[in-house]
């Protein structure tokens, strides 16, 4: 069903998929770039090496999906919830995330470099060995998440509360300036 909707949105030249639910879909190496997903729900879907670059996700719910190793570079996310899902190795570089909620999900080895986050929340997620270089974070709440081995080079962590998060082995600059003003438990 999703491939048909994708073809229809491309042929109509508006690149929009709205007010739909997709369940148990499997896509491999598909081009979903520059598509606008509005008021869409994905559940138990699997995307393998799909290209979502420059796509927009507006009022979207993602539950129990796997989008590992997909390309979401330069994508835009607003009022999106991702729950019980996997995005291991996915590329979210240069993305903009506003009111994004991530729960009970894994993003190990994912690339968030040069992305922007605002009014978003992360709860019980794994970001092991992920890349957060040169990221702008504004009003991000963190709870019970794992950032072991993550790279925060040139990403100010001021005002972020990592108190109940695991942050062993993270990478920052030689001056440790990224760590100024962050909260942790010792």
Enumerate the predicted regions with their spans:
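Tandem repeat scaffolds
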Residues: 1-186
């Amino acid at each position: 069903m999703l491939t048909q909707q994708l073809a229809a949105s491309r042929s109509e030249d508006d690149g929009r998929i709205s007010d739909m639910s997709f369940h148990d879909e499997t896509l491999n190496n598909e081009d979903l770039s520059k598509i606008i997903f509005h008021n869409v729900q994905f559940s138990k879907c699997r995307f393998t090496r799909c290209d979502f670059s420059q796509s927009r996700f507006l009022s979207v719910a993602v539950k129990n999906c796997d989008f590992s190793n997909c390309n979401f570079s330069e994508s835009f996310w607003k009022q999106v919830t991702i729950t019980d899902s996997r995005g291991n190795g996915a590329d979210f570089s240069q993305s903009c995330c506003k009111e994004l909620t991530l729960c009970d999900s894994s993003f190990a080895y994912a690339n968030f470099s040069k992305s922007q986050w605002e009014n978003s929340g992360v709860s019980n997620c794994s970001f092991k060995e992920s890349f957060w270089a040169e990221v702008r974070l504004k009003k991000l709440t963190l709870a019970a998440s794992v950032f072991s081995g993550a790279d925060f080079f040139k990403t100010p962590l001021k005002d972020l509360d990592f108190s109940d998060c695991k942050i062993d082995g993270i990478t920052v600059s030689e001056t440790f300036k990224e760590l100024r003003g962050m909260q942790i438990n010792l």
